[in-house]
Structures are given as structure tokens and as C-alpha cells.
């Protein structure tokens, strides 16, 4: 096996204009592959489930906000691992790297608790989303089976965060590429051939993620890099755990807040009927792919800033943000032009019903232009997290996203019960969040604060 350490990206030296895309693009490709299997599963469900195609699509789509809530909350913790390990690498603190790596692996065990809680409360949680009675049996079945994959999903994401903290981004991509092919193959067997429907899609996901998590674990056992895992050293280190939770928990809450707000919105969408649910589900799949493309630059910003902060290269931290904003802006503009321009054609791949395509296109035109705001607040929050400032972005997101979307659903939507109306809340809430995230960076000014702290320490 090739030494994975030789393939790492040096974050503290070299051209940021070159190294950030080298880091971000494999991360984006990994995230897109994660969504690709979901996209293809939606297509397979919609086209190979016979008369229940639209109902099955609605069942899977109605679960997206709920599964996103659980995944975002715990996967956000992996961002804490990323920052802590990257910062320790920048400081050349190999002891902390070792402790944080082994602590991170064991933190994924929380996935088993999620399974237990989810299996008990599956139907009540779906009922809270106003899932229609005709959709409930399939939606509940999908959720119960999907939750079995939670430990593998969490383990994979913690392992990926460990590799990325040292600049190895292709390894998680390679592992997921193999499991994605497996996932698609199993979907094609379980749904059209065995007629397992939504349960087949969920089972395929569980098997595929188990393979990818096992692959990365084996790689961590064999790697020659500083993040090598030794089974006898697997233990929860209190200091490492505290640092990871301090950064990761607010990051997880920040991600979960979006999911909570989307659950409220999904509840309003569900009240408009199965056809609207199916159309929204198809458009939502596109959003997940494009969002992850932009989010990869935020992850790059966090990791690069984390390492350079540890190495005390503060000017390079500021330049990292500037590069991520420019390159992320180009990606956002391209995404907006392509998806809005070809939206109807792309949506028709999910479901050929003209009415569903038209409804889905309303969502496309409402949300995708706001991707400029997403690019802005993601990079700003990623920059702050790289300095270990994680609570402020979480609070801004909670107030701006949850506050505005809750108000809209409960105070505005009841008076104008249309799909177009509920979609208007997205650009409004995203724009407000971006504005206050920029203000937070300007007020916190972490580079100036760092220099002032260093000057004070030197004077003493």
C-alpha cells in the first residue's frame, strides 16, 4: 500500500490558490458521491416502484429533514475533531494528535444510541412532520431501516475528518467511491428485481456505509502519517474530548438548526399534499449536491485556518478566507446559472409528471439564487471555527435561520398557503444569516485578537 502521508496537502506552505482547490474538490466530490446514491435511489424509487412511485418518493423525501437533523448534529462533532487535530498538527503536538484521533474514533459509538431512540420514536417524529396517512407506513419503514446505518455513517465521517485534518482528502473519496458503486448496484437489485421498495434503498445505504467505514478504518491502521490508529490506544481522552466538544458541539448545533428549521418547513410542505411533497423532494436532492460543493470550501477554510493558527501563521489565515471567498464565489455563480437554466430538464429525470416538474422548478428558482448567501456565511463560519470560535456562528444561525423560518411558517404561511410562499423564506433567512455572519467576523476579528494576546504575553 502506498504511503498516504506522501499524498497529503501542505496547508502551511505553498500557494493557497492551488492548495485550497486541491483540498476542497475531493471533499466536494466525496459529498456529492454521498448525495449521488441518494439521487439515484430517488430516481429508482420514482421509476421502478410501479403505481407507488410518487408515494415512495414522498416517503423518502419526508424523512430528509429528520435524518438530516440527526446526521448534522453528530457529524458536526467531526468538525471539532478536524479543528483540534489540525491545530495540534500545526503546533507539532503529536501527543495531542494521537489522543484526539483515538478519541474521535470512539465518539462514533453514539450512533448506536441514535438507533435505539429512533426505532422507539420513529412514528411520533414523522407524525410531528404532518406526514399524510397514506405516506406514513412507507416513511416509517424507511426511517427504521435507515437508522441501522447510523453508526457506520458517523464512523465514516469521523474517519474522513481525521484524514482531512492532515491534508489527505483523496482517501475518503476513494473509499466512498467504492461504496457508492456498491450502493447503486444494490439499489438496482433490491428495488426493481426484489421489489423491496423503500426498505431496499435503506438497506443498500446501510451496507454501503459499513463498507466505506471499514475501508477507512483499515487505512488508518496502516497509514504512516501522524494520524495512525493503534487499537490498544483506543480510549476517550478527557482533554481531547473537551476540546472536540467545545468546537464540534456548536458546529453540530449550527448544522442541526438548519435541519430543525427545515423540519418545520417540511411540515408545512407536507400539508400541501403528496404531489407537492414529491416535487419538493426531487428539488431538494439537487440542493444537497450543490450545497455540499460550496460547503467543501468552508471545510477547507476551517482546516487551513486551524493548521496555520496552530503554526502561528496568522496572515496566512486571513489570506485563506479571501481565497475561499473568491473561489467559492465562482462555484456559487456557476451553480446558479447551470441549475436554474437546466432545472426543468434535470427535475424531469426524477419524475416525468409535468405538474411535479413545474412545482419542483418553483423551489429551484426560489432557493438557488440564494446560494451566493450560502457561500458567504459558510466560509465566514468556517473561518471562525478554524480559530476555535464555534459558538458565535451557531447562535447566529439559530436566531436568524430558526427565528425567521419559524415566524414565516406559523405567522405568514397560514394566510398564504401556497408552495411559492413557503419557498420565499429561504432567500430571506439565508441573506439575513450571511449579513450577521459577516458582522461577526468583523467584530470578532480573530487575527487582531490573536496578535493582541501575543503582544500582551510577550510584554509579560
Where does each model-flagged region fall?
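Short runs within selected transmembrane alpha-helices of multi-pass transporters and secretion channels
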Residues: 75-78, 145-164, 172-180, 201-216, ...
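Small-residue hotspots at the loop-to-helix junctions and early N-terminal turns
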Residues: 54-65, 139, 143, 202, ...
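N-terminal transmembrane alpha-helices
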Residues: 11-43, 47-51, 65-80, 84, ...
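Small-residue-rich hydrophobic transmembrane alpha-helices
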Residues: 57-116, 120, 153-172, 266, ...
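Transmembrane alpha-helix boundary and packing residues in multipass membrane permease domains
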Residues: 27, 31, 43, 83, ...
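Short alpha-helical transmembrane segments in multi-pass integral membrane proteins
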Residues: 1-24, 85-149, 182, 193-249, ...
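Transmembrane helical elements of multi-pass membrane transporters/channels
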Residues: 22-42, 145, 156, 179, ...
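Helix-terminus/linker motif at the lipid-water interface of multi-pass membrane proteins
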Residues: 32, 36-58, 126-133, 189-196, ...
Amino acid at each position: 500500500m502506498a504511503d498516504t502521508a506522501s499524498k497529503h496537502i501542505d496547508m502551511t506552505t505553498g500557494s493557497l490558490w492551488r492548495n485550497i482547490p486541491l483540498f476542497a474538490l475531493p471533499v466536494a466530490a466525496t459529498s456529492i458521491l454521498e448525495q449521488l446514491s441518494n439521487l439515484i435511489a430517488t430516481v429508482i424509487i420514482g421509476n421502478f416502484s410501479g403505481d407507488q412511485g410518487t408515494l415512495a418518493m414522498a416517503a423518502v423525501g419526508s424523512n430528509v429533514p429528520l435524518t438530516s437533523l440527526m446526521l448534522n448534529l453528530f457529524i458536526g462533532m467531526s468538525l471539532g475533531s478536524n479543528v483540534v487535530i489540525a491545530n495540534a498538527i500545526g503546533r507539532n503536538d503529536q501527543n495531542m494528535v494521537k489522543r484526539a484521533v483515538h478519541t474521535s474514533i470512539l465518539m462514533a459509538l453514539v450512533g448506536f444510541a441514535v438507533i435505539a431512540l429512533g426505532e422507539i420514536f420513529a412514528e411520533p417524529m414523522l407524525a410531528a412532520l404532518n406526514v399524510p396517512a397514506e405516506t406514513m407506513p412507507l416513511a416509517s419503514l424507511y426511517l427504521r431501516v435507515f437508522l441501522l446505518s447510523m453508526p457506520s455513517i458517523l464512523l465514516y465521517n469521523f474517519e474522513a475528518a481525521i484524514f482531512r485534518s492532515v491534508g489527505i482528502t483523496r482517501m475518503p473519496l476513494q473509499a466512498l467511491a467504492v461504496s457508492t458503486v456498491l450502493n447503486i448496484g444494490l439499489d438496482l437489485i433490491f428495488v426493481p428485481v426484489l421489489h423491496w421498495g423503500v426498505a431496499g434503498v435503506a438497506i443498500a445505504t446501510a451496507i454501503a456505509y459499513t463498507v466505506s467505514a471499514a475501508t477507512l478504518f483499515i487505512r488508518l491502521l496502516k497509514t504512516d502519517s501522524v494520524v495512525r490508529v493503534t487499537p490498544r490506544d483506543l480510549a476517550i481522552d478527557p482533554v481531547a474530548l473537551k476540546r472536540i466538544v467545545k468546537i464540534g458541539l456548536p458546529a453540530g448545533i449550527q448544522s442541526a438548526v438548519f435541519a430543525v428549521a427545515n423540519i418545520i418547513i417540511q411540515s408545512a410542505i407536507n400539508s400541501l399534499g403528496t404531489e407537492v411533497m414529491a416535487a419538493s423532494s426531487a428539488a431538494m436532492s439537487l440542493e444537497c449536491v450543490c450545497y455540499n460543493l460550496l460547503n467543501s470550501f468552508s471545510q477547507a477554510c476551517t482546516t487551513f485556518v486551524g493548521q496555520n493558527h496552530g503554526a502561528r501563521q496568522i496572515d496566512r489565515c486571513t489570506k485563506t478566507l479571501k481565497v475561499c471567498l473568491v473561489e467559492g464565489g465562482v462555484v456559487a455563480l456557476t451553480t446558479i446559472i447551470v441549475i436554474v437554466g437546466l432545472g426543468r430538464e434535470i427535475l424531469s429525470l426524477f419524475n416525468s409528471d409535468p405538474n411535479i416538474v413545474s412545482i419542483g422548478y418553483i423551489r429551484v428558482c426560489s432557493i438557488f439564487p440564494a446560494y451566493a448567501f450560502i457561500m458567504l456565511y459558510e466560509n465566514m463560519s468556517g473561518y471562525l471555527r478554524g480559530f476555535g470560535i464555534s459558538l458565535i456562528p451557531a447562535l447566529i444561525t439559530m436566531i436568524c435561520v430558526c427565528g425567521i423560518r419559524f415566524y414565516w411558517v406559523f405567522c405568514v404561511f397560514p394566510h398564504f398557503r401556497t408552495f411559492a410562499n413557503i419557498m420565499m423564506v429561504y432567500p430571506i433567512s439565508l441573506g439575513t444569516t450571511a449579513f450577521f455572519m459577516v458582522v461577526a467576523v468583523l467584530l470578532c476579528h480573530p487575527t487582531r485578537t490573536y496578535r493582541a494576546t501575543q503582544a500582551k504575553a510577550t510584554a509579560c
